[in-house]
């Protein structure tokens, strides 16, 4: 799909990775909150299915988070690279993306702690780590 002049395809790929990374973070937080409150995250995903919060990420990565299965499909280290590219691109347009920056920092922490080869849904583990403080 043509989205604009030359270079727009690259920016679109970066935009896709913003949505993926931020949504993985949102799903991780939702599952963590449910678990902490004693709610069943499997039932949460079922309840959200078909509504505004439903997405492939909720269904696929949510299940991985619940199952604690972080076998890499999309690596954390690759998503960190993408987030760095996103922020570099944004900076070149004098554009601030604070949510993307937060997601990047969380992926960086995972990579720095030796989890670069896990699936990017392992962002859930960083949310869990933060909540064990």
Question: How should these model regions be labeled?
Answer:
Residues 8-126, 130-131:
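Helical "substrate-binding/catalytic lid" subdomain
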